[in-house]
Amino acid sequence: MPQNDYIEEHIRRHGRRLDHEERQRKRAAREVHKASAVAQKVTGLKAKMLNKKRRNEKIQMKKTLKAHEERDVKQASTSSDPNQALPTYLLDREGQKDAKALSSAVKERRKDKAARYSVPLPQVRGIAEDEAFKVIKTGKRKQKGWKRMVTKPTFVGESFTRKPPKLERFIRPMGLRYNKAHVTHPELKASFNLPIVGVKKNPQSPLYTQLGVLTKGTIIEVNVSELGMTTTTGKVVWGKYAQVTNNPENDGCVNAVLLLSS
């Protein structure tokens, strides 16, 4: 084996290739696919050794993530100097130990904002991908299967423009598109047929939210301007969140309950 550093010497003298960073980036991106292919093909003792190695890597990764999370948390410091005198107005306060310069007050405010709404359905059944999407065969020989047709009801906005058919991956049928929902006001005990403004959150996955899939437990935004709701300053409320409480694919309509801030 060579004992000298001729490679490093050449790099110092002549530099690297012009596309060195691009090649490194592509190589790093390929490593994931190579590791996946090896994990699927390997068997026997090599598979056991690989699984053990991956398990140790995941454990180490979880420990690192936990350490980062603990670094961000503000803790009360118990190691205060008892000999140090404190003013009277500071005696009832706990010493704060900042792990970061950023205050955790912003995070607490976000948590409080998220807890303002009590959701009628906190848990829903998971939907498999085979249940929500149907494979569409394309191509001259009908051998390509990269297109999917959404088999669940969806909401498509007025400003939506279809892609060219050769580039459209997800197809949302016109017969399964809904623009209005039967929204029940929990305090008034009355239902209103309100237009849907958008899909805020689908509990299944971000892809379902992006496609506007309406399943049980989905948080939608509805236009409540005709209800005459106002804010404390007297402004008319235009949009409110509501949660879908039924299975629209079975009932043929969207039923939802209005989410009111507590």
UniProtKB/Swiss-Prot annotation:
GO annotation terms (biological process): maturation of 5.8S rRNA; maturation of 5.8S rRNA from tricistronic rRNA transcript (SSU-rRNA, 5.8S rRNA, LSU-rRNA); maturation of LSU-rRNA; maturation of LSU-rRNA from tricistronic rRNA transcript (SSU-rRNA, 5.8S rRNA, LSU-rRNA)
Keywords tagged on the record: Nucleus, Ribonucleoprotein, Ribosome biogenesis, rRNA processing
Predominant place of localization: nucleus
Positions of region (Disordered): 1-38, 53-85
Subcellular location as annotated: Nucleus, Nucleolus
Top-level division of the source organism's lineage: Eukaryota
InterPro entries: NSA2_fam, Ribosomal_Se8/biogenesis_NSA2
Biased composition (Basic residues): 53-65
Locus of motif Nuclear localization signal 2: 51-58
Stored Pfam families: Ribosomal_S8e
Annotated motif Nuclear localization signal 1, positions: 11-18
One GO term describing the cellular component: nucleolus
Basic and acidic residues biased stretches: 18-34
Record's subunit section: Component of the pre-66S ribosomal particle. Interacts with NOP7 and RRP1. Interacts with RSA4 (via WD repeats).
Sequence similarity: Belongs to the eukaryotic ribosomal protein eS8 family. Ribosome biogenesis protein NSA2 subfamily.
Name by which UniProt lists this protein: Ribosome biogenesis protein NSA2
Species of the source: Mycosarcoma maydis
